[in-house]
Amino acid sequence: MIIDQLISTTSKYDTPTMCNAMDIILGTRSAIGFTKSSMVTAQNSTQPVVGFAKTAKIRASSPPLVSQKEINNIRIEYYEYIVKNEENPVVVIEDTDFPNCIGAFWGELNVAVHKGLKIKGTVTNGLLRDLGMLDSGYQVIAGSIGPSHAFVHLTELDTPVNILGLEIKPGDFIHADQHGAMTVPKKHLDALPHALDLVVKKEVPILEAARQRDFNIEKLKKAFQASWDIK
């Protein structure tokens, strides 16, 4: 599938609908492939963050074990990495202090920098701060909110990460919104448009029946059967 078409199509749906579409593709429900805890968002927007993962790890609970010069070099290397050779990059950062995160990597400065670099958004299990000062149009979906950056520093780049129970590898297709995040294996990307369309169509008979004034259990049974018959 053409990447621009994939992004355009999946951006029209929320993350729960994407999870339902994966159930259709797999032919069964699943307990993997999505985050397992509540998240917070930088922007009061339902527009999802959609793209391909650029991954890193951070820590804030203790000072870095290398010199400030090396820390600065790693940070520049990180910015170079996230803009290199990937269409629609989404930054995915694991805070290895989790579940006791104390320092925010995400605030006014990094939001401005990432927005300026044309990154599509961020998913992290770590902290977010500077609420009310963040540039509009850049979404950070984070694990929690806190006041300080503490000793926050990058420790690894381009590595598998775990965000609230969701395993993400560099280059994975990711879809996230205020509900949380999920990934779609690349082998299933071509099947997504049909599966998403089917999710919506199968809900229509039930929703239409339920919203009628004379709705009752018999109408519900018929609506469910109509939904099950849609293939």
Show which residues each predicted segment covers.
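Feature captures the catalytic cores and cofactor-binding loops of soluble hydro-lyases/lyases
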Residues: 1-170, 184-231
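Channel- or pocket-lining gating/hinge segments that regulate access to a cavity or pore
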Residues: 180-182
